[in-house]
Amino acid sequence: LLERGRQLPAVELLCPAALESAWPEDAGGWRVRLTDGREFTTRLLVGADGAQSKVRELAEIDTRGWSYHQKALVANVRTAEPHQETAWQRFLPTGPLAFLPLHDGRCSIVWSTTPEQADQLLALDEYNFAQALTEAFERRLGEIVQVGPRGAFPLRLQHARAYVKPGLALIGDAAHVVHPLAGQGVNLGLLDAATL
């Protein structure tokens, strides 16, 4: 996508860049100021900047939603058995555990669980975490043989009260955050982008 963007004459890539402020212009479009001081006007400002969207905040679009009282623990892991380019999911009493295939033979895991268990799993060393994950997944792909950096984030449902304003559109997690079960957040984000 980035390479295709570089090829388009009407696209100017500003990368890396971070948004400082944005405001609607009287003549239409949005004026944007970056943290490095650069400013420009755009006919369409797309907020694709995640659940804590700065674009949504600057556009003064409120959200509604609730907490699932769970955390998602995420990491990339390597398993003893090949994933066969198949996504796997196991439903545990505390929430689903998903193994999503990556192109290099690793899996991306999303382990939805209680905040307490997520914190306990994060506190484990790599060996003990790999053992806990292997057991939770019932050795379906053999032993977990390598664990990348781990992180966790709280799970919540969140919807922007508006997805569009004149000259502005919110897509992906900036517009709507859903439980990671079955990867619907990714699917919704891709549909948002295709709709634009």
Task: Indicate where each model-derived feature is located.
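Conserved N-terminal helical subregion
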Residues: 1-58, 65-71
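Pyridoxal 5′-phosphate
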Residues: 27-29, 83, 189
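Short gly/ser/thr-rich secondary-structure transition/capping motifs
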Residues: 27-31, 149-158
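Conserved FAD/dinucleotide-binding core of flavoprotein oxidoreductases
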Residues: 92-154
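Central beta-strand plus flanking loop segment that forms part of the substrate or channel wall
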Residues: 52-87, 97, 103-107, 113-117, ...
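Conserved mid-domain beta->alpha element of the FAD-binding
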Residues: 153-196
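Short Gly/Pro-enriched turn/cap motifs at secondary-structure boundaries
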Residues: 64-67, 87-91, 152, 159-160
